[in-house]
């Protein structure tokens, strides 16, 4: 309700980046085991995720033509720094979501990437409405979803190939809550 009431006050949404950071900190608090392999992998995803976002923002090549609003905080190369953490969190959550699936790593990578594309599809209208980003054409192009699929596929192939394993009792609940949050807002925005 608070979000719907404050849609005319975009400065309220500058906290969006803080929620991403808080999600990351909570995940790391309950994450186990901590290992060098885990931290190198997570850092690599963050750095490469940010780099892809920066290239995308500045060229339109990866996801299409878009610009970030102010709600995600401090930017470098017109890209919010929190996008590095966002990629880490999303890949982490989906990786843990499918940890019990005993299937070929390529198929698992494909399914994981599809899940992230569906997540993005549900999140996009809400993110646009909350000034997280704006698309040049008004709505995200197909190019955006293809970009999400390809980038996440590469991340998942890597982490499933190196057999990164961990346990986190919060991750599935956090993913479900985020998905339901964006899904509910998406539905509400269509109704009002």
Spans of model-derived segments:
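Aromatic-rich, lipid-facing transmembrane alpha helices and their immediate juxtamembrane interface loops
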Residues: 1-192
């Amino acid at each position: 309700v608070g979000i719907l009431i404050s849609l005319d006050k975009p400065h309220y949404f500058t906290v969006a980046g803080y929620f991403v950071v808080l999600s990351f900190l909570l995940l790391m608090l309950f994450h186990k085991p901590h290992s060098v392999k885990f931290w190198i992998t997570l850092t690599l995803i963050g750095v490469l995720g940010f780099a892809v976002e920066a290239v995308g923002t500045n060229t339109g090549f990866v996801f299409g033509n878009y610009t970030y609003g102010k709600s995600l905080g401090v930017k470098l190369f017109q890209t919010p720094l929190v996008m590095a953490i966002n990629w880490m969190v999303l890949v982490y959550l989906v990786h843990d979501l499918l940890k019990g699936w005993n299937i070929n790593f390529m198929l698992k990578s494909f399914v994981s990437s599809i899940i992230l594309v569906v997540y993005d599809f549900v999140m996009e209208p809400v993110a646009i409405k909350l000034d997280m980003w704006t698309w040049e054409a008004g709505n995200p192009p197909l190019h955006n979803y293809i970009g999400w699929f390809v980038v996440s596929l590469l991340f998942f192939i890597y982490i499933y190939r190196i057999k990164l394993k961990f346990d986190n009792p919060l991750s599935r609940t956090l993913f479900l809550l985020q998905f339901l949050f964006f899904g509910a807002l998406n539905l509400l925005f269509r109704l009002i």
